């Protein structure tokens, strides 16, 4: 797919590591969630940012405003509906509007989920305070005759097969995958391990590229509630130590 974007001089940043222009970090406090939202704005002078959260049905939940030069805010969701894996993959939507003299000049929306997780050596993976055994697959973004250029149709077919197996977690080996598939992981409640293409042996000349790709992977995907781990350790069998 190809997307052509036309923007005003003041707009949400398109060059911040390929990220969507807004970062959402929900933190659970009892039954409530505090949503730390940050928008990245190019040419912010004279602009404000409006943050609006809606539920799955599109009903308003909470909102806030911030100066575009430092577009950060904390928004509280009372009695937050948790994103709880395949059992209940509930998603909220944050819509962020850039206003200049009261006029909307840019707008983006991103979905997110309210959840907490932990990994315990005795209890295993814990989601929202409850043991959540992981049973999953490793997935490559690849098809005969298509290669890496999958469409939404093939991504959905892959996800349907994974769900049919009864899996609830996916390792996305071992490069950035399509946002279409990350969205499907959010919607279906998959727990995701994401990776960059760092394979087999360390190349000293590739250190800067490794750090750049990991930064991009995190920034581009941090809003996805499905992602719980990012990795650069594919087939690390030939060396005993690595320092980045």
Task: Annotate each PLM feature.
Residues 233-240:
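Conserved small/polar residues in nucleotide/adenosyl-binding loops
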Residues 202-212:
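Active-site-adjacent "subsite" loops/lids of carbohydrate-active enzymes
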Residues 1-184, 189-192, 213, 228-229, ...:
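Secreted/periplasmic carbohydrate-active enzymes, especially glycoside hydrolases
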Residues 196-201:
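Short, acidic/turn-prone active-site loops that include or flank metal/cofactor-
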Residues 181, 217, 233:
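Aromatic/hydrophobic pocket-lining residues that form π-stacking "cages" and hydrophobic walls in ligand
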Residues 210-224:
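An active-site-proximal structural segment forming one wall of the substrate-binding cleft
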């Amino acid at each position: 797919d190809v997307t052509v974007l036309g923007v005003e001089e003041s707009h949400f940043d398109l060059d911040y590591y390929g990220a969507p222009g807004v970062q959402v970090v929900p933190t659970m406090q009892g039954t409530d969630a505090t949503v730390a939202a940050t928008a990245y704005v190019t040419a912010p002078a004279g602009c404000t940012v409006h943050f609006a959260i809606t539920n799955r049905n599109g009903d308003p939940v909470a909102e806030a405003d911030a100066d575009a030069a430092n577009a950060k805010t904390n928004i509280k969701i009372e009695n937050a509906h948790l994103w709880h894996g395949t059992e209940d993959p509930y998603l909220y939507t944050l819509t962020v509007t850039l206003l200049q003299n009261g006029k909307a000049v840019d707008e983006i929306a991103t979905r997110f989920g309210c959840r907490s997780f932990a990994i315990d050596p005795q209890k295993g993976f814990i989601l929202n305070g409850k043991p959540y055994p992981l049973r999953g697959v490793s997935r490559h973004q690849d098809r005969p005759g298509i290669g890496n250029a999958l469409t939404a149709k093939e991504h959905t077919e892959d996800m349907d097969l994974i769900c049919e197996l009864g899996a609830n977690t996916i390792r996305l080996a071992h490069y950035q995958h399509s946002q279409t598939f990350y969205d499907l992981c959010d919607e279906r409640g998959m727990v995701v391990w994401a990776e960059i293409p760092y394979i087999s042996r360390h190349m000293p000349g590739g250190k800067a590229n490794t750090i750049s790709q990991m930064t991009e992977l995190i920034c581009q995907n941090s809003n996805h509630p499905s992602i719980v781990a990012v990795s650069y350790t594919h087939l690390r069998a030939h060396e005993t130590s690595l320092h980045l």
